[in-house]
Amino acid sequence: MKNILVTGAAGFIVANFAELMVKKYEGKYNIIVFDKLTYAGNIHNLDAIKDKITFVQGDICDFDFVMDTYKKYDIDAVVHFAAESHVDNSIKNPFIFTQTNVIGTHTLLEAAKQFWGEGSENKFVNVSKDQVYGTLGEKGYFTEKFWGV
């Protein structure tokens, strides 16, 4: 069975994603959820699936802890949602936003690269707010496919 790490999992949206993954892929994937439990996360958001997931409390900026998590759970894929996203808080303390959103993402990527090796076919999916796509215009559409979800 493959092991998927989902970051930011105690947030409302991500907890619902984790629940969907558990319901849709139970027996195919082990879901390991990772969260620092800051103001944006609530462990009780995961209550519906707490017996079907593995919860890891940690900081995505801590390289050694992230690498230990990859090794301990033999992570095959990462779905990275963890981010500081409240605009008002970003104005009050931009350093924390840069630390989590840039350094944290880099830490997860670097640990994945070292753990999986160069040229690996393992998956790292970075999830972000819709603003990163820019304006679509009158024609076309954005699509994303990830394990059929």
Regions found by a protein language model. Give the residues of each.
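N-terminal Rossmann-like NAD(P)+-binding domain of SDR-like oxidoreductases, especially those catalyzing
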Residues: M1-V149
